[in-house]
Amino acid sequence: MEGVPKSLPAIVKAFRIQEKVRGIGFDWDDKTQVWDKLLEEIEELKVEIEKGDNDRIESEFGDVLFALTNYARFINVNPEDALERTNKRFIKRFQIMENEIREKGMDMSEMSLTEMDVYWEKAKMKYLSK
C-alpha cells in the first residue's frame, strides 16, 4: 500500500487503494459483482444495526462506503467529486427553501418535517429550472 498517502480524505484514499490493488489483479471482473458485494455489505450493516453494537455498526458502515466507492470506480464516477456536487446542490436547495419560508414570514424551527418537505420539493423544482 505504499504510495497511498495516509493524509488523504477517507473516500479518496479508498478510491486510490482500490486503483492500486487493481493494478496487481485483485479486482472484480465487472460492476455486477461489485454491486452484489455492496448489497451484501448493506445487509451486514442492517444486522449490526439490529444488534446495536456501535463499534460493529461503524465497521460495517465503513465496509458499505468502501464497496460504494469501489462501485463508483467501476461506473467511472469520482466519489469525492460526486459527494461534493451533492453537498453543493443540497446547500443551494436548502437556501432556496429557507428564503421561501422566510418570505412567508414563517420560522422553520416551528414547522413540522412534513411542512418543511413541501418547501423542499418546491426548492428542488426551482433549482432544477435554473
Model-inferred region functions:
Residues 1-61, 65-130:
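Flexible "arm" and connector segments at domain edges
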